[in-house]
Each structure stands twice: as C-alpha cells, then as structure tokens.
Amino acid sequence: MIKKIFVTGSAGFIGFSLAKFLLDNGYHVHGYDCMSDYYDVRLKHARHKILKGHENFSFTEDMLENQEVLDKTITNFKPEIIVHLAAQAGVRYSIEQPRVYLSSNITGTFNIIELAHKLKVNHLIIASSSSVYGANKNMPYHETDKTQTQLSVYAATKKATESIAHSYSNIWKLPITILRFFTVYGPWGRPDMALFKFTK
C-alpha cells in the first residue's frame, strides 16, 4: 500500500483538505508551502495547526523556485506520489504582478516535474485550472476542448505547465494526471472566492 505522499500547497484550501484526508486514513504526508500572503496568512496557519496535530505530518516552508531546498526535501522524504497543488492563484492579480506567476507557476512546477522524473515516483498529480479554456465558447467544457486562447497571465502559466507535463510524460513515460479545477468551495475555503463573498 502506498504510504508516503508529498503535497505542495498544503496550507492552501485544497492542499489542506487533501492532506487532512490522507492523514486521517493513515498516510504519511509531507507538506510544502511558502505561506504566501495573497490572502490572510492566519487562515493558512490555522489549517496547518490541524495538520500538525497528526504524528505522520511533516512540513517545509519555502518557495518552489528554491530548487536546492525542494530537491533535498523530496529526496529525503522519498514519496511514492507527489500531488502538486501549490501555485500563485488569482486571475486579476496576474495582470498586476505577471512575473510572480511566471516564477511560481512555471518555474516551480517545472522543478516538481523534474524531481518526479528524477526520483521515478509512482504518480505525479498536478493542479491546473478551468481558466485554460479561455475564450472557448463550448458549454459545458470538455477535456478535449481546444485550449489555445488564454485570457490572463494566470491561465497562460497553467497552460504552459500542462504542456511541460505532457512533454515529460511523453518522453520519459512519467505517470502524470492533470486536474483542471473550477470553483472549489467548502469548509476552510479561500476568502477571495465568489461563493465565500456571496455568503458574507
């Protein structure tokens, strides 16, 4: 049975929810998060306080772009699966701070993919976004729809990481699954999301 799973973005809403589920079911989880202040960091610390209550949880706070720390952390943990959920989120913010997105989302994800290949993990799961569908007018969206017309820097970085992942899967036969999330909601959710704002 697979026991060791590396989760990036473990202080984020989806990362926290996944890590908690895995820990509750007996897995060993190592979380990796830079604790970005894109929204209230107190919420991220509160989520992590719950995770730290599990003896099978360990954590590294750093940037995905810090290849040396990332390499050492993953190599020492020796995960069978990597779930890459960390990213600089926010479509509007990407217009104001595009370089942040290029660095975090593209360079950070490339580092994860390269390490997954180097360590020959059983599976790499990467979070993408519904924003890659861009100007696509087909409704409802389908996995096979064209994704060449992104409308924001955020979406473009997500599409770029999908392309890098596809190339590694093709060249090295690295098992990769990409998840295109739409609006995700629930307990401990992000305060900047529409549903959270509506309830307020």
What do the PLM-derived regions correspond to, one by one?
Residues N170, F196-K200:
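Alpha-helical substrate-binding/gating segment
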Residues K159, V184-K197:
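Glycine/proline-rich active-site loop of Rossmann-fold NAD(P)-dependent oxidoreductases
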Residues M1-V184:
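N-terminal Rossmann-like NAD(P)+-binding domain of SDR-like oxidoreductases, especially those catalyzing
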